[in-house]
From Swiss-Prot:
Protein name: SPI-1 type 3 secretion system pilotin
Keyword Lipoprotein: yes
Species this protein is from: Salmonella choleraesuis (strain SC-B67)
Keywords: Cell outer membrane, Lipoprotein, Membrane, Palmitate, Signal, Virulence
One Gene Ontology cellular component: cell outer membrane
Similarity-based family: Belongs to the InvH family.
Major place of residence: membrane
Function noted in UniProt: Involved in the synthesis of the type III secretion system (T3SS), also called injectisome, which is used to inject bacterial effector proteins into eukaryotic host cells. Pilot protein that is required for the proper localization of the secretin InvG/SctC in the outer membrane. Necessary for efficient adherence and entry of these organisms into cultured epithelial cells.
Listed Pfam families: InvH
Gene that encodes it: invH
Length: 147
């Protein structure tokens, strides 16, 4: 299955998203839905565990489990890892959705920089901690449109 990678221009999101090639270029081999979902989950877990940054408690638990520590440390590592990977996956999907809906930010470095400036301002506002990455990006986009 041929895919190409599209890098997301978000300063918090490190990595690239797999994007299927247009159907005119190649036709991917279809897999049953359950297998595709399992493969996507496995890929995103592998991807998030290979990030250049890892939360310190996750790294600590990871090293403990690698040294064959007791079962509880190993279990905590698996839980921390899965929570981190799930949050990473959700964040990445939300950012990808936003940039698919607003491709102008992927075409212009200047527009992207303006969006990121507004994004940072939104993050610093009281009450913004409960917003998802998509809502925060959308709020920054709406502010830019109002200018």
């Amino acid at each position: 299955m041929k895919k190409f990678y599209s890098c997301l221009p978000v300063f918090l999101l490190i990595g690239c998203a797999q994007v299927p090639l247009p159907s005119s270029v190649s036709k991917p081999v279809q897999q049953p839905g359950a297998q595709q979902e399992q493969l996507a989950n496995a890929n995103s877990i592998d991807e998030c565990q290979s990030l250049p940054y890892v939360p310190s408690d996750l790294a600590k638990n990871k090293s403990l489990s690698n040294q064959n520590a007791d079962n509880s440390a190993s279990k905590n590592s698996a839980i921390s890892s899965s929570i981190f990977c799930e949050k990473y996956k959700q964040t990445k999907e939300q950012a990808l959705t936003f940039f698919q809906e607003h491709p102008q930010y992927m075409r212009s470095k200047e527009d992207e920089e303006q969006l990121m400036t507004e994004f940072k301002k939104v993050l610093l506002e009281p009450g913004s901690k409960n917003l998802s990455i998509y809502q925060t990006l959308l709020s920054a986009h709406e502010r830019l449109q109002a200018l």
